[in-house]
Amino acid sequence: MITWHDLYTVLTAVVPLYVAMILAYGSVQWWKIFSPDQCSGINRFVAIFAVPLLSFHFISTNDPYAMNFRFVAADTLQKIIMLVLLALWANLTKNGSLEWMITIFSLSTLPNTLVMGIPLLIAMYGTYAGSLMVQVVVLQCIIWYTLLLFLFEYRGAKLLIMEQFPETGASIVSFKVESDVVSLDGHDFLETDAEIGNDGKLHVTVRKSNASRRSLMMTPRPSNLTGAEIYSLSSTPRGSNFNHSDFYSVMGFPGGRLSNFGPADLYSVQSSRGPTPRPSNFEENNAVKYGFYNNTNSSVPAAGSYPAPNPEFSTGTGVSTKPNKIPKENQQQLQEKDSKASHDAKELHMFVWSSSASPVSDVFGGGAGDNVATEQSEQGAKEIRMVVSDQPRKSNARGGGDDIGGLDSGEGEREIEKATAGLNKMGSNSTAELEAAGGDGGGNNGTHMPPTSVMTRLILIMVWRKLIRNPNTYSSLIGLIWALVAYRWHVAMPKILQQSISILSDAGLGMAMFSLGLFMALQPKIIACGNSVATFAMAVRFITGPAIMAVAGIAIGLHGDLLRIAIVQAALPQGIVPFVFAKEYNVHPTILSTGVIFGMLIALPITLVYYILLGL
């Protein structure tokens, strides 16, 4: 029977964690002590130092030779049951998908054991429960988070193949991933070079695109180009290594540059005199267009009649060409469409380089559509200009991404990218851009995947590159190795090293909760995914997870306090690491965010209810 003293002991252990979280929340939302940049620095410290050292402290001080294998087996069986059920649902039903499989698996089986579980379970069931929680933490860090990464990278590899090789994926026999590609999460533009070997099979090389590399070296200029910038090969046309004489010849000048100001000055409404910086959030599309000086000999209209071109090309062939000159009739067509569009309309520039001679009109249906303004082809270089309105377009796109600039980030991006990819026929030097797909990873069910061994090797390479950059990987492995050595030969850690670690690990628990409070304060809404989806997520977290754990525990033979500890541990709030992965790979991040934030708020009363009911 649970007494009031037992409840007070639990509250004594848990309430201080919530105090740290509330202080952090108030520091941002109420008192405005920390700016978002400062919050980012604190979170960085917690992620790199505090939490890894906290993990190392708990793992290295836990005796691995005294593990309760029955308890560990029950925890493992719970996760295997959920994984098998979700895999069957995803593959055998129409509503199933890989994304929902990953999300439900994260919600139901991966709780916040390190930060919340250890102090809570120690207060409820004693120090032995804390030792069991450490065993769960070891398995989470080494096995289950790695499996989660594997699933996310499998999704990324599947999307890559579906986008780039929709009909020839089964012919791929090898992938070579260049060293600067860390993940297939879609944050970087990627290129694929496919070479046909002597056996007629495809050998694919995956690398970062030139645009992605250049973007790391440039400070992008804030722009009002909303969602259309996603498709530009650079985030801004203002800074580049473009040949300025070519640029001026296109604009109608007979010679090279006529002054010491560049394209950034021309298209910015800010003065170039003095140290005034270029970035501005002024709506330049709504302002008066300032063009070049009048030139009577020019056969091209004034520069103010059409916007600045994007002077950067993505080349897959190594051949350079000059930009295409625009015929008068197409310029008039641009002017007419610009006058008809609303003042919020944006123009999308797409420069596509292809070794194929197929015209752009083959992709865009002859160019007679409302969106296509101009198209030319000179030595394989094609320019596509598309007027993109801020108003949402009617489309059959499925959900799975935010609507940016009137284009659904799932279907709209794939639609345009498939068009550009269609310009490049499959050959020995074909290249294509990989853009991050939306939340829905479903697609062409007829797409054939490469052999399992090829896919597995690609995914393992990417998972390995992610793991070796994660401090928690090192802290967990080193802590486990030290525990195996220390408890086998009774070796003590040197005092200097022990104190150096403990001074930071002691702050790890409070800093982790403080960081969580900062994260909550920076979110626009506590429930970001809608009430119905949030209710479903909470039901999976606090009902389905403990129920499956009870079934697994009884099947293994747990009883008494061991079974109670297993069930309460499964009812802890959502773990933070699955949310971080969901954010990186853009797979239902709002659901995991709600699971972390709202779950943390309601976790204490729910775990207390489980504690009281199981103690009856």
Swiss-Prot record:
Record-level GO BP terms: auxin export across the plasma membrane; auxin polar transport; auxin-activated signaling pathway; gravitropism; root development; root morphogenesis
Region named Disordered: 302-343, 390-411
Modified residues (Phosphoserine): S223, S240, S280, S358, S395
Compositionally biased residues, Polar residues: 312-334
Chief location bin: membrane
Protein name: Auxin efflux carrier component 4
PANTHER family found in the cross-reference section: AUXIN EFFLUX CARRIER COMPONENT 1B-RELATED, AUXIN EFFLUX CARRIER COMPONENT 4
Pfam family, one: Mem_trans
Location of the protein in the cell: Cell membrane
Organism lineage: Eukaryota, Viridiplantae, Streptophyta, Embryophyta, Tracheophyta
Disulfide bonds: none
Transmembrane segments: 8-28, 39-59, 71-91, 102-122, 132-152, 477-497, 501-521, 536-556, 562-582, 596-616
